[in-house]
Amino acid sequence: MNRWPVLLLLVFSLDSYVKEETFLSGDLASVSVLSENVNGVIIKVKDDNKKIIPIPYLYEDKNIFIEAINTNIKAKYVNYGESRITIKNESLVNLSPNDSLRVQKEAKLIETVLASSDFSIMPSFEFIRPVKGQITSRYGKQRYINGQKRSVHLALDLDGEVGDKIIAPMKGKVVLVKDLFYTGNTVILDHGGNLFSSYAHMNEAVVSEGDFIIPGSIIGLSLIHI
């Protein structure tokens, strides 16, 4: 989960009117669309139709094509800083062939899960904080593990005590409950309209795949952070 600034795009296409503007890596853009016949969920804001467009994490400034609105937009790289971690168990840093294969399979599984969203669910974007703990690591930081440059941290870490209740931030459907190599006990929720949220490093998951949950529902118990 990253920070949620809502930016306004106003460029002519058949279904959208977008202003020339530069967006930031990892942000969300709120796009005015002239027609409701646009792929994905359209949110009504007074008399205006809005579509939320996620801007991917970028390693450099570039123009990116947004298929949902058939438009190119400018996106700017942002240096979100770095974090350096020391892990004593080298088997978690330099993976064995079997662990590497497991990681690849799990990545494909997650990709499959995120490829399909339940459009009967309308996201509200009124998120409840899943735990009370403070933010311990923000989105977008370049990770260094034992001095080695690794992937960017595309999540938000929240502090917690062992056994703290983790609640659903908004309504949705449980689409994955699994113990994964990198993130341990993990739950992914589908909030509709291709909006998903993920909860990792859990002590225990208390929901099952296919469950429909409401805001504030307990989905699991925390370890030291999620």
List each model region and its residues.
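A residue-level detector for short acidic-glycine micro-motifs
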Residues: 137, 176, 201-204, 221
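Short histidine-centered loop motifs in beta-beta connectors
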Residues: 192-216
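Cationic-aromatic interfacial patches
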Residues: 14-81
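Short, well-structured beta-strand-loop connectors
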Residues: 165-174, 207-222
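Sec-dependent N-terminal signal peptides
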Residues: 4-12
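Conserved small/polar residues in nucleotide/adenosyl-binding loops
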Residues: 225-226
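Surface-exposed, glycine-biased beta-strand/turn segments
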Residues: 74-183
